[in-house]
């Protein structure tokens, strides 16, 4: 699976209808809100607060170096870089997302 495909899969958490690209409704607004809140507060293990502060989006990291981040009602972005930091999150992935949300002024805060 490519990271383009991964970001497309997670778009249901970013679009305002909480549905697939084919229009199949997956979640209620309440469910999507809860999932995004959990991702914002828990998606990066012990570094979740730092990710929220630096990037400002709900997200989830994987030990393979992947990160998925969601801007509700706007977009979903996936990045990958295998070098992990001390908290087992992608070092360059987090750095890229921080720069991206700063330059585009697209943090949720």
Can you name each region flagged by the protein language model?
Residues 1-10:
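A small/polar active-site loop signature that marks catalytic segments
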Residues 12-109:
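Structured C-terminal helix/loop/strand segments within mature extracytoplasmic catalytic/sensor domains
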């Amino acid at each position: 699976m490519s990271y383009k495909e991964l970001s497309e899969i997670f778009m249901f958490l970013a679009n305002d209808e909480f549905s697939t690209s084919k229009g199949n409704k997956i979640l209620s607004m309440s469910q999507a809100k809860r999932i995004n809140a959990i991702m914002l507060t828990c998606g990066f293990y012990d570094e979740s607060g730092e990710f929220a502060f630096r990037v400002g989006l709900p997200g989830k990291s994987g030990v393979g170096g992947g990160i998925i981040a969601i801007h509700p009602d706007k977009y979903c972005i996936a990045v990958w870089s295998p070098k992990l930091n001390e908290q087992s999150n992608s070092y360059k992935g987090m750095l890229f997302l921080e720069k991206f949300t700063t330059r585009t002024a697209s943090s949720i805060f």
